[in-house]
Amino acid sequence: MAKLSFTFCFLLFLLLSSIAAGSRPLEGARVGVKVRGLSPSIEATSPTVEDDQAAGSHGKSPERLSPGGPDPQHH
C-alpha cells in the first residue's frame, strides 16, 4: 500500500512540475521584427565567390585535405 501511495505521489509531482514548467507561446510581431533585423547581418557574413578569389584560391584545389578512408574520391 505504501508503494502504491509513493508511486501516485511521484506521478502527481511529475504532472504538476511539467505543467509549471510549460512555456508560453511567442508573439508573432516580435519574432518578425527580430528576423527582419537579422537579415542584413546574415547577408553581410555569407561568403561569396569574390571572397574566395580575394583569398587567393583562383580555382585551385583547397589546401585542406580529406581524412582519406577507403575511397577518398567518393565525395
Swiss-Prot record:
Sites where a glycan is attached: 70
Region (Disordered): 40-75
Signal peptide interval: 1-22
Residue stretches in coiled coil: none
One cellular component term from this protein's GO annotations in UniProt: apoplast
Domain of life: Eukaryota
Annotated GO MF terms: receptor serine/threonine kinase binding
Modified residues annotated as Hydroxyproline in this record: 67, 70
GO biological process, one term: cell-cell signaling
Membership in a protein family: Belongs to the CLV3/ESR signal peptide family.
Protein name per the record: CLAVATA3/ESR (CLE)-related protein 2
